[in-house]
Amino acid sequence: MIVMNGRELTQGHFPDGTLSFKLPEDLVWDEEGQIIEWKYESDAELFSLICLKRWIDEHMTTKVWLVLRYLPHARMDRTEEFFDVFTLKYFCQVINDLNFTQVCVLDPHSNVSIALLDRVVVAPPDNLIREALDRSDAEIVCFPDQGALKRYGKMIDNRIAVYCQKRRDWATGKILGLDLIDPSDDVKGRRILIVDDISSRGGTFYYTANKLLEAGAAQVSLYVTHCEDTIYQGEFYNDLVKTGAVKKVYTTQSLLKEVKPGIEIVIHNPNKDSQ
């Protein structure tokens, strides 16, 4: 989905599958500059973005900010074998070539992407996490691994934090379980918010939430900045969220297409001043 100055821009296709794209004649143009928001759904939208930016460059002189809350291709932030294609690198090269005034990304999964993007501004999720803490009335924050602890540990004010350590089958990468690291006694009878950057099927959070509930937590909720719709296919949503064992999942509007019961959106609002 591509939105400019708060208005969704629709695209169609000709019978041969090529792009049909016309801007609304009553589209509002901002004298200070234009904000394009790309809510990533597929790489096909990249061509629409290219065409839109080229059209603006040809027809007017204006600043253009790109808000790309979820930065795609972060999973491919390195190559290990000769025939691996470094998709993140080439994606960032295309964005750089469009010469946006600035590119705003929200809580990117990989720091490699930040090094590859020009004129990039990283929007931290601290205010979003605080809002999720307020909504959930959480007393304690749980980080599902040390990476999340290092990433978000300074964003939780004075709340008590606990973290987990995953146990994996290193041959397959599959999570076998996890251990709650001391002070696990703080969990009993408390309201807890799990905090991390992204969820796919939610396997990590399935094990984390179960461990917290086993330790006597009174309430468990989850905050992730980015959430894929595949969360609805996993045990975490179907066994824990739908049954009420996990109270809520809080996420931003960056990626999730369908909001089902148990999911709440925490809105990230971009503006030119913060970029």
Feature roles, as predicted:
Residues M1-Q275:
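PRPP-associated nucleotide enzymes
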